[in-house]
């Protein structure tokens, strides 16, 4: 299994907090799945958690080489946690189609937070270096 792409993103908490204040449920439902929202709501640092997931989604869009455009929906990328707390990416829709076409079999993601920022790094893996 080899690394075929990498994406990274940095998001400041005030940016996400402002979007939530200005657009409320419309923003949340457009960008985050129900389980991502539930995870943030169940955490005292909800904005930080949303910012981390937003950064992870941006990092994934960078590694598939598209950015957010066309038929791609933010909710095509869902960030969940394993039982041990490790973030994990689930793809669907247009992003899944693009990842499959690129030969991506797994995406490893890491999210960290500072006092004001969330940073996410995503690495795309393929079965072999002879990816599509």
Language model features: what each stretch is:
Residues 1-132:
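Core catalytic alpha/beta fold that binds nucleotide/phospho-ligands
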